[in-house]
Amino acid sequence: MYGASLAWAADQYPDVKFIAVDVTQGDIGTDAIPANCYCITFKEEQAGYLAGYAIVKDGKTKLGFLGGMAVPAVIRYGYGYVQGADAAAQELGTNIDINYFYGGQFYGDANITSRMEGWLNKSLH
């Protein structure tokens, strides 16, 4: 989300060193990461995997994933969540039901609230 701004700032301030957290070369939109930038990325899929695995091991079988925007970090987390949940379900010999949705924003609104309430009501019946 901030890649273009980082590329601009790195060009404007070549003597300044920038550290960009959760930014990749693809986010920057240039052929290479500027020499005065250091990009650090998390392995979101690993955190997501552990979350999905743990919730199924805790006995939950009706799950939901709501990602804000479908940006690479959120997508990786979501995929990890599904993979972890599936791995735990296979170990337990059980079936799971996962609702999966991207809200297209990083804030709530009436439409997202309604969808989440629908998921909750579906899981209670």
Descriptions of predicted regions:
Residues 1-125:
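A residue-level marker of the well-folded mature domains of exported/periplasmic proteins
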